[in-house]
Each structure stands twice: as C-alpha cells, then as structure tokens.
Amino acid sequence: MSKSLISINNLSKVFDNNFTALKNVNLDIQKGEIIAMLGPNGAGKTTLISIICGIVNPSSGTVTVDGYDIIKDYRETRSKIGLVPQELTLEAFETVFNNVSYSRGLYGKAPNPEHVEKILKDLSLWDKKDIGLRQLSGGMKRRVLIAKALSHEPSILFLDEPTAG
C-alpha cells in the first residue's frame, strides 16, 4: 500500500474554554481520493481542515501531508494545500487578477501570469480580471476564492462549506 497523502493519527483539539472539538481522529487519505465530511454545526469539520492547513494547532496527535509533519514542516505542507474558506476573505479594493496573483507569492511561487490567466479562464472570470472585487456578485467572489486557492498549484484542495453564501 502506498503512503497516504494525508495521514491523521490520534488527533484531538480542546479549545481554551475546554470545548472538545476533535477527539482521537484517525484518517488516511490517498492520492486521488475525493472525500466529503458531513456533520452538524459544531461537529469539528472546519477545525479538522484548519489543523491540516496549519491555521489551528492540535492539542495532541499528528498530521502529515505527503510525508511532511504539519508543525515541523509547516511551509512545505502549506505549499501543498489550497484552501477555499467558508467566509469571503478577499482584498475588496484589488482587482481579480491582482488578488489571485498575490496569492502565488504568499507561497513563495514566482509570478506566472499565464497560469493565473488559465485559472481565471477555467473559472469564467477572465473577462472580470480588471474589475475590483467589490463589484462582483457573491458567486463570482466564491470563484475568485477558488482561483486564489489554485494559484500556487497545490496538490490538495480543501473546500470548507462550498455551498455557503
């Protein structure tokens, strides 16, 4: 059996108010697998995604991404992951093109206007590339978030609450 792309072992998260969001989670995800996490509000789905992405630290347990530990090898693991958050988090006064291009740099990727153009065309946003984000509809803003998540060419993509908004 090949090594897991994402390996979660005995992962727990207890917040400062003693709320247990995750308790002894074990999960292995192989390359090419597509999974969906379903559960009620407060079940820990976003917490799990946030830990894998390095946004929240676990209380205990380990997570590896492509063999790299999410804590010890933070930059390496984070560069492999694209995240489309559940909340609209965009630079409102920037253009679509600049917003997506800027995201590449956050992951140490050199500018690549051709790659950004391809993503924007694939998401039917190319004709909006020079428009400020404040002028876009909610659905278009969601697509910009997807473009940002894909801009640094990750091998893993998380969609947190993809139907929200």
Whereabouts are the PLM-identified features?
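Conserved ABC ATPase "signature" region
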Residues: 101, 105-128
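Conserved ABC transporter NBD signature motif
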Residues: 61-69, 77
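Conserved catalytic motifs of ABC-family nucleotide-binding domains
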Residues: 153
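Catalytic Walker B motif of ABC-type/P-loop ATPase nucleotide-binding domains
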Residues: 157-160
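Conserved ABC ATPase signature
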Residues: 132-136
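Walker A (P-loop) phosphate-binding loop of ABC-type ATPase nucleotide-binding domains
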Residues: 40-44
